[in-house]
Amino acid sequence: IRAALEARGDAREVILVPESAHGTNPATAAFAGYKVEDIPATAEGRVDLEALKARLGPDVAGVMITNPNTCGLFERDMKAISDAVHAAGGFVYCDGANFNAIVGKVRPGDLGVDAMHINLHKTFSTPHGGGGPGSGPVVLSEALAPFGPLPYTARTKDGVVHLIEEEDAEEFAKEHFGGALQHFGRMTAFHGQMGMFTRALAYILSHGADGLK
């Protein structure tokens, strides 16, 4: 998100985090150097949409939201929340902690989500005992895809999935994205244990891809 904002010369410093979001969200935003501000919940435990809209402004980089939230409730105003944040120039990050409740039923991208991490141990059967092995793939919207860390995977129009590293990133971007990537560097390791990706894929294939595409 910061890389995308900097690319357009926009220095925003606030991340909004609803009270109903996963407890790690404010810590994550603060660790990334953002100022964190709370958005209150309604009496029924969902994001107060009007309070969110009232706080949006030129200093807000985005919102970190968990859907379903930590109260176990689906954020019914999710699309309206995303539309409001986008209209104000910000981005929407969704915590995938409770994704297993909606996977196959609704697509985060259709709700306006720009970035989301997926907890494979919570949603796609990989082990979590003993502290891991952890694996948290991150998916990005078209707006944020050119600004993600390397390496990452991208599917071209011919259906081929590519693993993008630094040495081929610029050539790939010119051919498929119409311009240079503006990634913020390479991660020291990949997004967790590759073996967990394989196990999650086997789990998905065994159940079928209906509702996942």
Question: What annotation goes with each model-predicted range?
Answer:
Residues E165-K213:
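Structural motif of enzymes handling amino- and sulfur-group chemistry
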Residues I1-H176:
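Conserved PLP-enzyme active-site core in the AAT-like
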